[in-house]
Amino acid sequence: MHETRVLIDADACPRQALAIAQELCREYGWSCFTYASFHHQLSGPNHITVDAGPQAVDTRLANDTRAGDIVVTQDIGLAALILGKQASSLTPHGLIFDPEHIAFHLEERNEKARFRRGGGRTRGPAARTRVDDQRFAEALRFLLEKERGEIV
């Protein structure tokens, strides 16, 4: 059995979600790793800095992920790769990706991209709220407890 870990795509992770994840990892005794390009001002013993190339962070994070890990990302394509490795994935807003629904999320992403390529405009993300923080904390806690075998 390998060390249980939470891996965070820190390029687009709100600082509050990052702080929540680090606190919960301390509480549960899990290692927490952050991944970001060198353009981001992050550091620490468990921070991995990668090149600034397109998809560099996602590629490194996907390559480092092992079965049983939990990955925090807003990238639906990366989440699909993570699920294929028998790991869990959730967004900083608390949406847990699951194998049964990932195809829907990928199709929705593709439809929005097609719409934008055709000249359409889509809304950006809403401002982060305390409800988002609570939802993320609850979802991450659920996955941590599930991985520990406390939830079936």
Feature-to-residue mapping (PLM):
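Nuclease catalytic cores that cleave nucleic-acid phosphodiester bonds
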Residues: 1-152
